[in-house]
Amino acid sequence: MEELTAKEENQQVLKVLEALKQASHELQSNPRPNSAIKALLELETESESILSTDPSLSALSHHLSSLKTIVDSLENSRARHGLRSFVTRRVTTHEISRVAGSIESEIQAWIDRESIENLASALAHAPPLSDDDEKALIRILAHFQNRLSQGFNRELQDLILKSKVFSELESVLINSNYPRIVREQVAFAIDELIRFNKDVFVGQILMGQAIRALISLSSSSSLKVLCSLIKSTKSPLVDEIESNGDLSKIINLLKSEDPSIQVMAMNCVLEIGYFGRKEAIDAMIKADLIRILVDLQRSELGGDLIEMGRWEEEERARGRRERRESRERRFLESHPFASCVARFAVQLEVGEGLRQREKRAVKLEILERVREACVSDAEAATIVAEVLWGSSP
């Protein structure tokens, strides 16, 4: 009961602070005695009893009192005329904007502290989770991701590090006893942490077990996160995947019966091709990647750019008229493995992982394996031509 009461009190405080934050945000862009100031001062009166009970809100209480004093000063200066009064009003208006900014910062800091505490507490619940706990955790994780997406904030980063949030997230991700949907939401939160500050959190990704967990989870969502992390972390992450022997697992997902998993695995393969060093590329080719790509290109979801020309004619016959880029994008949405062998070869060619001499050698090996994998001379000729001349979406 006490815990419930504390939650209710926090919700009441949060509701008041959100209203104060909105009013102070509006006041920064228009620091004049308008509806925002009126709302802020009314809220200051209403929230006095709430703010006085929380020591961490004492600075906010001080800023609100200062704002009231400054607004009174501005109102008094309007009754007078002359240069001095004009300058006073200008300075006072600037002070209102500054104090409003301080109010917003203090409120956000309080909200961040509460949010990180709630996140750490929710992540500490051992599985199995009740339906209510699962929904609450997913909601808290979504809120956390949204906060991180607003950009870097040093105070927030300090809270995250002090609360060891990354370690808690990783613990949930690698624990197969948690529901898949929870682990996927945790994966998205980890990805957002890397975007928030790659320099601080990438080391924990490379040294921990998160990458192996993403691959073993083998869902379209986990592969989407993996693909994003490869883009962010580049060659070092590909090196880690290769050293763990997990490249073959990603390639095997190209043979999944779920097209969404196949597509995301293909995206991962393309990113690995761009950033992978020779050891990684060699491992992928030895894992029979080229034969698998040829099979995918031959499938209903495959095709080549020549087929795209025929598809364009059919679309025009139906009355569709679009720019070429839009038509290409729509074609690849419905044929995600079109020209996939050449697209992989292009990634190697333009990528950062291979030296020029290595690129030439790998291209020759790809051509050889294409000829071995094709079921007809015509198919081989088409794919070889695409690889030689380049084919990209």
Residue ranges and their predicted role:
Residues 46, 50, 77, 126, ...:
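Residue-level signature of the C-terminal ends
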Residues 5-8, 12, 28, 35, ...:
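Short amphipathic alpha-helical molecular recognition features
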Residues 3-5, 26-27, 50, 122-131, ...:
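Helix-loop junctions that connect tandem helical modules in alpha-solenoid scaffolds
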Residues 66-69, 73-198:
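Alpha-solenoid helical-repeat scaffolds
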Residues 133-146, 178-194, 218-228, 257-271, ...:
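Alpha-helical solenoid repeats of the armadillo/HEAT superfamily
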Residues 1-105, 109, 113, 329-393:
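Long C-terminal extensions of eukaryotic subunits of large macromolecular complexes
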Residues 159-168, 204-219, 240-249, 279-300, ...:
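Alpha-helical scaffold repeats of the Armadillo/HEAT/TPR superfamily
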Residues 212-268, 277, 281:
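Eukaryotic tandem repeat interaction scaffolds
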